[in-house]
Amino acid sequence: MNTGERTPISARTVLLFAAVGVVAAVLGLVPWLITGMRLPLQNLWAEPVVAPDGVTAAPESMPIALLPFSQYALTFTAALLITGAAVAGLAARLLRARARRGAIVAVLAGVVLSQLVALLQSALTAAAGLQDRLESVVYLTAATTAGVVAIVMGAVVVVLIARAPAGAAVVGLSIGALALVQWAQGLVYPIFSLVTQASPAIDAVLVWLPAVLVAAAIVWAGVSTVGRVIGALVSLLALWIGPAAITAISSAAGTRVYAGYPFEMAEVVGQIFRAALLSPATWRAVVAAAVIAAVGLALRRPVLRRLDGRSPS
């Protein structure tokens, strides 16, 4: 009889689960790793970063940073961290980590500590080259805080996906799906790249990918309980609010005009956020996800019945 007790695990198994978290964190950083990991050009950099001609910017001369530490890459950095966390949570669930005492903690420790190391290295690298002025301290603090918030959000995603019931896990999967789209965009179109060849087919996939992934998560969880219904609704809400928030934060953070005016910047963020919420593109994604999920749920029931009918009695 199943008593609900979790199986104790050895120290070796704990290390293996921790390694899963580390590998997931590294996978999350892939779109940045393939760029060469040069710290983005900084507005407050103390020394001029120019080519031998003395005029052209030379980003390749910037130091190595494990994260794209820049106000122009806040949402991309968050996507890298949350995607890695979502991969860790999914791996933990597939490996049935919640049935083993300490396994989820090991996975969580692996991914969070790895990401903290990456953030600390990037922040220290930036701090070493910034001008010695108040604006540098404010910028460094704000960017580091944003990274910490993303890591905390990722930790929540790990727990939701790896340990929570299906109704809550679908929310974690949906948050991970939104991050994955930004991750994929950075993989196809490397951030800060000067030359990119746009592909209409890839762009179309990136546009509809969030709706498809959120719908897939809803279909996986089902809607057989009140908790799962709530989880599905929250996932659709995240699909509506998440992209609007990303648009607002990216637009405001990338505008130097409001850098010294936090209240005005907050007002601009609010205006862009409200406009993005009412954008037809945002609503199309939500409607598409709802339709795909409805079709998937309708097909899910007979498929499960057929599978149950084939199982031995």
Positions of predicted regions on the chain:
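Cytoplasmic membrane-interface segments at the C-terminal ends of transmembrane helices
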Residues: 2-14, 86-107, 127-130, 153-176, ...
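Membrane-entry segments of alpha-helical transmembrane domains in multi-pass membrane proteins
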Residues: 10-19, 64-80, 101, 105, ...
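Alpha-helical transmembrane segments
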Residues: 14-32, 108-117
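Long, glycine/tryptophan/cysteine-rich extracytoplasmic
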Residues: 19-22, 28-78, 128-130, 188, ...
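Hydrophobic core segments of alpha-helical transmembrane domains in multi-pass membrane transport
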Residues: 20-32, 85-86, 175-182, 212-219, ...
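Long, hydrophobic/aromatic-enriched structural stretches that serve as scaffold segments
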Residues: 67-129
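Hydrophobic alpha-helical transmembrane segments
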Residues: 71-92, 145-155, 206-219, 288-293
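Generic multipass alpha-helical transmembrane bundles of integral membrane proteins
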Residues: 115-264
